[in-house]
């Protein structure tokens, strides 16, 4: 069966840039990788075809020869039996894209971990230290990360002599490729560790003490360097990122460095003025309510908000007044309110109800305009 054109295989034009070729390869390799298509021989064949096309078209010399001679340029010795390494999609697919596929593979850094931590508003504002328990991969304490049975060590690969690469004949060229025997590592484990089964790492839970700085807010994250998964074969560990989520508060609402709350005031105090206690994160403080205060009036208490973890000045506490209508009145109270209401006169009395006068004046004008 005739081979398909390499450009056609990757779905790119013959003038495609290396960046375009790499992008196409990444997409197709992810699509056809055997780990995603287990038992699908056709997908495996397409994966090999995509890999072969990528290796030719990202090598300047090979691409020039292919553009001039086509597949005939590589018929002597074929692809040298290099085949496709399906062991790790990230090592295989992304290794070539970022240059790792053409040199000896290095042990990979451990993966980063993420943990979502829920805090109360008080904890977020003041800072807190909490213990967390997370699943992770740690270096095996039996083989110390080598993957080899206790008392033994990995041996040098006899195929590549420890280089991790072999020279393969491909048409007019001799090129280096990752060793198919040791997968580019340069070493072979003959007797695997009984605990980690040759992986060098084991799954376990670990407990950490995490210090959350004062002033954090939802969306902030704290990085713990080196507390992620252990790296393979002695490589550095990844990091742990603790993502902060602040729970809603029954009194305060936070907006950046400011806090907001609603303060209920009875109608008598709102009319005559007075003093009430309002809560802050540091305790209760007195707030003076001037006479004739209306619902929605905002009072600012300087420095009673939050100091952001990023620095800057302390925020403020903004208290919004809500004038309450009295309920469950006894007969005496109702009588007094009737007398008070009668003393106000009609809705048009500007002196007692300026907003009501403005409203009813507007209503009267609206209907007057309709009847003109």
Swiss-Prot record:
Requisite cofactors: Zn(2+)
Query: Zinc finger, CR-type: residue spans?
Result: 127-205
Compartments where found: Cytoplasm
Q: Name one GO molecular function term.
A: unfolded protein binding
Q: Which Gene3D superfamilies match?
A: DnaJ domain, Heat shock protein DnaJ, cysteine-rich domain, Urease metallochaperone UreE, N-terminal domain
Q: Which InterPro entries match?
A: DnaJ (IPR012724), DnaJ_C (IPR002939), DnaJ_domain (IPR001623), DnaJ_domain_CS (IPR018253), HSP40/DnaJ_pept-bd (IPR008971), HSP_DnaJ_Cys-rich_dom (IPR001305), HSP_DnaJ_Cys-rich_dom_sf (IPR036410), J_dom_sf (IPR036869)
Q: Which spans of this chain does the record mark as coiled coil?
A: none
User: Any idea which UniProt keywords this protein has?
Assistant: Chaperone, Cytoplasm, DNA replication, Metal-binding, Repeat, Stress response, Zinc, Zinc-finger
Q: Which PROSITE patterns match?
A: DNAJ_1, DNAJ_2, ZF_CR
Q: How is the cofactor bound?
A: Binds 2 Zn(2+) ions per monomer.
For this protein, the record's SMART domains field holds: DnaJ
**Where would I find the J domain in this sequence?**
5-70
One GO BP annotation is: protein refolding
Domain comment from the record reads as follows: The J domain is necessary and sufficient to stimulate DnaK ATPase activity. Zinc center 1 plays an important role in the autonomous, DnaK-independent chaperone activity of DnaJ. Zinc center 2 is essential for interaction with DnaK and for DnaJ activity.
Instruction: Tell me the PANTHER family matching this sequence.
Output: CHAPERONE PROTEIN DNAJ (PTHR43096:SF48), DNAJ HOMOLOG 1, MITOCHONDRIAL-RELATED (PTHR43096)
Q: What is this protein called?
A: Chaperone protein DnaJ
């Amino acid at each position: 069966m005739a081979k398909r054109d390499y450009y056609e295989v990757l779905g790119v034009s013959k003038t495609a840039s290396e960046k375009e070729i790499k992008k196409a390869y990444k997409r197709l390799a992810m699509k056809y990788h055997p780990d995603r298509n287990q038992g699908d021989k056709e997908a495996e064949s397409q994966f090999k075809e995509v890999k072969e096309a990528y290796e030719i078209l990202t090598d300047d010399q090979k691409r020039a020869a292919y553009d001039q001679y086509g597949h005939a340029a590589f018929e002597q010795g074929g692809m040298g039996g290099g085949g496709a390494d399906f062991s790790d999609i990230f090592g295989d697919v992304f290794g070539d894209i970022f240059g790792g596929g053409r040199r000896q593979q290095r042990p990979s850094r451990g993966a980063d971990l993420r943990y979502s931590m829920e805090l109360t508003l008080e904890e977020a504002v003041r800072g807190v230290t909490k213990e967390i328990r997370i699943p992770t991969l740690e270096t095996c304490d039996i083989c110390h990360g080598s993957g080899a049975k206790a008392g033994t060590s990995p041996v040098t690969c006899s195929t590549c002599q420890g280089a991790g690469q072999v020279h393969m004949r491909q048409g007019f060229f001799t090129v280096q490729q990752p060793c198919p025997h040791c997968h580019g590592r340069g070493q072979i484990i003959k007797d695997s560790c009984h605990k980690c089964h040759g992986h060098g790492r084991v799954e376990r839970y670990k407990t950490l003490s995490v210090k959350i700085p004062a002033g954090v807010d939802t969306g902030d994250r704290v990085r713990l360097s080196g507390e992620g998964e252990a790296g393979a074969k002695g490589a550095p560990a990844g990091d742990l990122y603790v993502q902060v989520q602040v729970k809603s508060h029954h009194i305060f609402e936070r907006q950046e460095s400011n806090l907001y709350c609603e303060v209920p005031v009875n109608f008598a105090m709102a009319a005559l003025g007075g003093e009430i206690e309002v809560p802050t994160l540091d305790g209760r403080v007195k707030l003076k309510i001037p006479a004739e205060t209306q619902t929605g009036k905002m009072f600012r208490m300087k420095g009673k908000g939050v100091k952001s973890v990023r620095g800057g000045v302390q925020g403020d506490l903004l208290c919004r007044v809500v004038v309450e209508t009295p309920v469950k009145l006894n007969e005496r109270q109702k009588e007094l309110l009737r007398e008070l209401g009668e003393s106000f006169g009609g809705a048009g009395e500007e002196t007692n109800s300026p907003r009501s006068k403005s409203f009813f004046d507007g209503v009267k004008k609206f209907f007057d305009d309709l009847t003109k």
